[in-house]
Amino acid sequence: MRIKAVFSVMSVVLAVVVAGCGGGSKSGDKASGDKGGAPNSPEVRKLIRETFGPNDKAKSGNISGVIDITVKGLPRYREPIQVSVVGPFSDAGGSPEAMFNVSLGLRGGILGGDMYIKGNDALIGLGSTAYQIPDPIASDLRQPLQGHPGNTLGKVLGVFHIAPERWAKNPRIVGNARIAGIDTIHGTAGIDTKALFLDLAALAKRLTALRITDITGLPREVDRQARQALQRSVKSATGDVYTGADDKVLRKAKFDMLLEPSAKDRRILGGFTSIKVVANLDVTDVGSPQTIKVPSNRGSYSALQVSLDALAEAVK
């Protein structure tokens, strides 16, 4: 069964880009030197600034991410969940634009839809129709685009409350690797889970405004008690990030995280016994011109609500 509908591009990007902040590394890379490999070295701090700070090389490209999620302890999610997000982003002369096609495999069905950020608009695309998001919600969605000056990729990630530079704990450079024909610098770090779950809480509010939480069964909010329980539940988080050696643009991230809450925390978090997340993100065609096309057929926000109501019933 295929249901054409919108799903949370924000949660997809959040989970994938956390990969850039995961701990752990793999052998086989050429060492960058003892100094560069030290945690919190001047070299790695500079690399973080160059990757997520002003960088006119990060003005366009394509994002492709896949997340596999395995939940235990909740019958509603007894089958593995897979989320994918694919789409271009562009500086567009100083006004960041993006289009993400999102697909979610959930309980034997597939949900799919598009999200557009173009000009002053934010839209949701279902099939050949684009639905305008009302100004109050769209303005909040676009507000982070004012940050990350000179880094379009960073601006787009900021829309989804993604800030790896805030989450990195004891970052270090572990080597070099060639990714899709590009020489990259391989970095790793631990995760500041307090900062991570604060951003997750902000993201939940945005998802609720778009009714994503109602449709998917995600929590409408992540309060302080839940954030603390999540922090305590992280058993392992390993990840790797690869940044272009010459242009310092993020090229690839990999992430593997396991949460196993205690019996007490399970009651706070809804009852799951474990969640395993494996994610991969690739950024390609960096610097290549990208065109963001929004369907000419437009639908009203009220019409979108009818479609979302039908979707919510279909996935119960």
Predicted features, each with a name:
Residues 1-10:
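Bacterial N-terminal signal peptides that target proteins for export
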Residues 17-20:
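C-terminal motif of bacterial Sec signal peptides marking the signal peptidase cleavage site
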Residues 22-316:
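Subset-of-secretome marker
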